[in-house]
Every structure is written in structure tokens, then in C-alpha cells.
Amino acid sequence: MIQPQTHLNVADNSGARELMCIRIIGASNHRYAHIGDVIVAVIKEAVPNMPLERSEVIRAVIVRTCKELKRDNGMIIRYDDNAAVVIDQEGNPKGTRVFGAIARELRQLNFTKIVSLAPEVL
């Protein structure tokens, strides 16, 4: 469960290393973001000499959460960290690589480009 002020790792090579959630996109009363939700975030830590810089406001999609994800078949998935992938206004990833495993639910939410870049889909 990601809420405003939550710090997240970045799971791509866009240039950001750590994000802080500012807002959850969607209904105005969304309190928490889960896997597949789009958030507005600020970059807290960035790689030097990259296009994205610290204190820049961006959009990102959640790909991993520490909170369990229960599937319809009864399987429960839990990750070790909270991670997101930086996206543009159209929903395409800004980076060219995605690191770590991501959930299969992103494919149903039309983030197919992120799924195709991921090394492992759980």
C-alpha cells in the first residue's frame, strides 16, 4: 500500500533512483495505491548526468509493493521492496530497461511495454 509521503525505489534506468509519492491518480478519495496504479511523485535521488533531476515532478506506475497481492486463484504475491517505473503522459516508460520482477496484472492494465521490458513476470 503506497500512500503520499511513501518512498519508492525506481525499477528502470530512467535516471531516478528514489521517488516520493505525492498523489495517487484516479478517484479523488483514493487513499492507497496498489500494483498497477499511477502516482505523481517527486524524485528524491537521481543519477548524475541523466535527463531526470532531483526535485522533478513525474508520473510513475507501481510495479512492486511489500503489501501482499491476492489473486483470484488464491495465490499471494509479496515483494521485498516498493518499486515504480517512471512513465510519460501516454503511459510509456521513460527508461529502456526494467529491473527486477513485476506482476502479471500490469499486462491487463495495458502497460504491455513495461511487461515486455521486464526480465521476469510473476
UniProtKB/Swiss-Prot annotation:
InterPro entries: Ribosomal_uL14, Ribosomal_uL14_bac-type, Ribosomal_uL14_CS, Ribosomal_uL14_sf. This is Large ribosomal subunit protein uL14c. The keyword Repeat does not apply. Its main location: plastid. One of its GO terms (cellular component) is chloroplast. Binds to 23S rRNA. Signal peptide: none annotated. One of its GO terms (molecular function) is structural constituent of ribosome. The lineage of its organism: Eukaryota, Viridiplantae, Streptophyta, Embryophyta, Tracheophyta. Part of the 50S ribosomal subunit. The keyword Secreted does not apply. GO terms for biological process: translation.
